[in-house]
Regions:
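Short active-site neighborhood of thiol/selenol oxidoreductases, capturing the structured segment around
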Residues: 1-9
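Thiol-based oxidoreductase modules, predominantly thioredoxin-like and allied folds used
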Residues: 6, 25, 29-43
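The canonical Cys-X-X-Cys-His
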Residues: 11-14, 56
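Short alpha-helical
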Residues: 12-13, 40-43, 75
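Typically the conserved alpha-helix immediately C-terminal to a functionally engaged Cys/Sec
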Residues: 13-27
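A short glycine-leucine-enriched loop at secondary-structure breakpoints
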Residues: 47-51
Length: 88
């Protein structure tokens, strides 16, 4: 299971989401978390149809299971993580 986090170091919403992500990921140690520094015109972000930052894409076996755009609470992140965590 993998969490792709598309964002930018200069994005205020991205910085605000960091404590929420850290809290939610604490219970899911088997999930790989990959931060992707995105920018206008970057092909990887476009291939995942990312329009706003942060966008979290939750993958299991290479397939998108869930997506959150600008998450603002730990519960929504934890719920999406539970959907991809094979340990649960």
């Amino acid at each position: 299971p993998t969490l792709l986090e598309f964002g930018s170091p200069t994005c205020g919403h991205c910085r605000a989401a960091q404590p929420l992500l850290a809290s939610a990921l604490g219970a899911h140690t088997g999930i790989r978390h990959i931060k992707i520094a995105d920018a206008s015109g970057r092909p990887l972000g476009r291939s995942f149809k990312v329009n706003l930052w942060p966008t979290l894409v939750f993958l299991r076996n290479g397939h998108e299971i869930a997506r959150l755009v600008r998450p603002d609470n730990t519960t929504s992140i934890a719920d999406a993580l539970a959907k991809i965590d094979i340990a649960e």
